[in-house]
């Protein structure tokens, strides 16, 4: 799995139908989906997210990253 920045992860989530549901006043952005359960929290801004964080975000969002 390649490394991702928080900006890239947010773009992927938005393309998959996730939307930001609370204003990002801190260092994290929260996303919800109309049909998928749960929420996804992305630390932002981060140039390079740790691989474990990226894997957890992908698992929570029910998406597959290359």
Locate predicted features.
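Basic nucleic-acid-binding interfaces
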Residues: 1-66
